[in-house]
C-alpha cells in the first residue's frame, strides 16, 4: 500500500526539524489548546490547595529550623529528644506533602495531555478533526490505564532515586497517544514500540520544555515578587485555620503559576511532533529510506522500487547488484548479513 506523502515527510525529519515542528504546532493551535489545558492547571492548583494547606500549616507550626538542626549535627551536638521528635515528624510530613503533591500533579497533567493528544496528532498529520469531538473521545475506559501507568506509577517511582521514573517516562510516555487509537489493540506495547530507540529524544524534549518554562517563570516571578507578593503576615492570615481564605489563596497561586498555565500546551505539542515522526518511521519499517542527503560519509538514497534480495552464496566471478542498507542508506557492494555501517541485521529480508 502506498504511503501518504505526509507520513514519509514526517519520517524524514531530523530531530531539529521535529522540535521546530513542535513549536509550529504550539503556535498554530494555541488558541484551541489553552482553554482546556489552562482549566486543568487551575484544577491542579485548587486540588493542591484543598488537599495540602492543612498539612503545610501543621509542618510550619512545628517550628523546626532545619538549618539550625543541621548545623548542630555537623558540630556533633546531640539533639534533645524534643528536637529529634520534631525533626522526625517534620521530615515525615514533608515527604508526605511531596508525594501527594506529585501524585495529584501527575494524574491531572496526564489527563490533560490525554484530552488533547488525539486532536494534536490529527492536526499534525493534517487529518480532519475538531477539538470538541477529540476532547470527548479522550475520556474512555482506556484512559484509566494511562492514569495508572503515567499518573500513579511515575510519581511512586520518583521516590526510588528517580531512575524507575525516568525509565517509565522514556518508555511509555507515548501511551497518552496510543491508548485512544482505534486501530491499536495493545496500547502499552504500541507505545513501547514507537518509543524504542527514541529514549534520549524524549528526555531531551522534556528537558527543553522544562528549561524554557523555568527561564520564563524565573523572569516573571522576579517581577511578581517585587510588585504583587503579599506580606508574610497577610499570607499567613490566609493560611491560618482561624482566618483561612481559600479564595485569596487560589487567586494568589494562579497568579504565581501564571507562566505554567500559559505555557501548558508546549510540552504536548513538542511530544506530538516527536511521536508522529517516530511512529512514521516504525510504521514504514525497512521500506523507509531518507531522501538523498549526506550525513558525513554516508549518503541516503531515494526509496527503492524493487525488493532487496540477499543471496546466501555468491561465486567470486558472479556480478552482484549493489544495494543500500534500508536503515541508514549505506551503499553495500558485497551482500552481507548485516550493514557494515550501522550494524543492523538483514536476516529478516529473506524471511
Question: What residues fall within each predicted segment?
Answer:
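Hydrophobic transmembrane alpha-helix segments characteristic of membrane transport
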Residues: 111-139
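Interfacial aromatic "cap" segments that immediately flank transmembrane helices
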Residues: 11-43, 132-157, 170-217, 245-249
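Hydrophobic alpha-helical transmembrane segments in multi-pass membrane proteins
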Residues: 35-56, 94-110, 145-169, 205-234, ...
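Juxtamembrane transition segments at transmembrane-helix termini in multipass membrane proteins
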Residues: 2-4, 9, 63-71, 118, ...
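Alpha-helix initiation/capping motif
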Residues: 8-11, 165
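Membrane-interface interhelical loops and short interface/amphipathic helices
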Residues: 56-91
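A conserved helix-loop-strand patch within extracytoplasmic ligand-binding domains
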Residues: 79-82, 86-95, 99, 135-153
Amino acid at each position: 500500500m502506498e504511503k501518504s506523502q505526509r507520513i514519509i515527510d514526517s519520517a524524514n525529519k531530523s530531530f531539529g526539524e521535529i522540535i521546530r515542528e513542535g513549536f509550529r504546532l504550539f503556535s498554530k493551535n494555541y488558541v484551541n489548546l489553552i482553554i482546556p489545558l489552562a482549566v486543568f492547571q487551575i484544577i491542579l492548583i485548587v486540588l493542591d490547595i484543598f488537599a495540602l494547606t492543612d498539612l503545610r500549616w501543621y509542618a510550619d507550626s512545628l517550628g523546626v529550623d532545619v538549618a539550625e538542626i543541621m548545623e548542630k549535627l555537623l558540630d556533633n551536638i546531640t539533639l534533645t529528644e524534643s528536637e529529634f521528635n520534631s525533626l522526625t515528624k517534620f521530615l515525615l510530613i514533608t515527604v508526605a506533602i511531596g508525594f501527594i503533591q506529585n501524585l495529584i500533579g501527575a494524574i491531572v497533567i496526564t489527563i490533560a495531555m490525554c484530552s488533547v493528544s488525539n486532536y494534536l496528532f490529527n492536526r499534525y498529520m493534517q487529518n480532519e478533526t475538531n477539538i470538541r469531538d477529540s476532547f470527548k473521545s479522550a475520556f474512555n475506559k482506556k484512559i484509566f490505564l494511562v492514569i495508572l501507568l503515567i499518573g500513579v506509577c511515575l510519581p511512586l517511582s520518583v521516590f526510588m532515586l528517580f531512575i524507575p521514573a525516568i525509565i517509565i517516562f522514556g518508555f511509555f510516555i507515548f501511551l497518552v497517544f496510543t491508548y485512544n487509537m482505534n486501530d491499536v489493540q495493545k496500547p502499552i506495547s504500541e507505545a513501547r514500540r514507537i518509543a524504542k530507540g527514541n529514549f534520549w529524544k524524549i528526555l531531551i524534549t522534556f528537558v527543553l520544555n522544562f528549561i524554557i518554562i523555568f527561564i520564563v517563570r524565573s523572569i516573571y516571578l522576579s517581577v511578581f515578587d517585587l510588585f504583587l507578593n503579599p506580606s508574610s503576615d497577610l499570607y499567613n492570615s490566609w493560611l491560618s485555620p482561624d482566618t483561612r481564605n481559600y479564595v485569596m489563596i487560589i487567586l494568589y497561586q494562579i497568579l504565581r503559576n501564571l507562566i505554567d498555565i500559559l505555557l501548558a500546551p508546549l510540552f504536548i505539542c513538542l511530544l506530538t511532533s516527536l511521536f508522529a515522526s517516530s511512529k512514521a518511521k516504525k510504521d514504514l519499517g525497512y521500506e523507509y529510506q531518507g531522501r538523498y542527503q549526506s550525513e558525513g560519509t554516508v549518503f541516503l538514497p531515494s526509496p527503492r522500487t524493487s525488493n532487496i534480495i540477499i543471496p546466501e552464496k555468491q561465486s567470486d566471478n558472479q556480478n552482484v547488484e549493489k544495494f543500500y542498507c534500508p536503515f541508514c542508506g549505506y551503499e553495500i557492494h558485497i551482500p552481507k548479513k548485516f550493514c557494515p555501517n550501522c550494524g543492523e541485521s538483514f536476516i529478516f529480508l529473506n524471511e
